[in-house]
Amino acid sequence: MSVLLIAEHNNKELRPFTLNAVTAASQIDQDVHAVIIGHNSEEALKALSALPAVKKVISVEAPHYENFTAENFAPIIVKLAENYTHIVSSANTFGKNLMPRIAALLDTSQVSDITKVISNDTFVRPIYAGNAFATVKSNDKKKCVTIRPTSFDPCESTGGSALIEKVDGLEEFVQTKFIKREEVKSDRPELGTARIVVSGGRGMQSGDNFKLITEVADKLGAAIGASRAAVDAGYISNDHQVGQTGKVVVPDLYIAVGISGAIQHLAGMKESKVIVAINKDGEAPIFSVADYGLEADLFEALPQFLAELNKLNTIQK
């Protein structure tokens, strides 16, 4: 038995969640091999081979792998899967696009979004928007598993020296054509990996009022999140959405402002280490998961909070 981990990268460096996926993979079996598919990805390959938990790295290089299209990735991974019992990736956009194709080609059932490894064939995954957890056992000979990155600690990133094997790629899948990629560039921390997240909900009342969230986030060095209601209302773009249909976050500090706390939103943030809720409705569900709750008008509370943060900054200077 051995595990093949699909490494996520940008051809220059590993994506942070790859380290979390390695931890999950090593809980399935200590013999973890990783495959890195790309073009001119030598730096990412070097970083991957330095992970102590990875015993072997398979490198597949070709120009048509540069843009990470799942139609090109799936066939080569299926070919490599002949020697493995488990294929593992993160349950993010990358993994959700790729792993179902791999599972279909292997004619196996996918086990999705696991939060815990019980044994090499039994896993725990959330259901009902995170309000319950199911224990799932897979009897398939080959198991395709996606892991919720925030449920596993990142592995050590240095000190390893994995064996590197270079493998030729397959022919390009010509029915799909890559057009372009648009990436949001920001000086802020990435929402999925930020230590502090400040989120606003429908209670912000308008997009212009979200500048209050922005100011608080600037002072705290935080990422900006939002509820689906705020996104649907057009207050902020959907790449900030936290929840069942958005990003799942587990920061050290999550500040929810004007968010009532629908179960879909709670599913994306209730595992945060410390949760602070500000809402004028004392019966709002968000208070049921909050470590600290402030029943107040956010348009009065946030300016006062900013004033105190400014005082702290002045003292520190």
Indicate where each model-derived feature is located.
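N-terminal glycine-rich FAD/FM-binding segment characteristic of electron-transfer flavoproteins
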Residues: 1-317
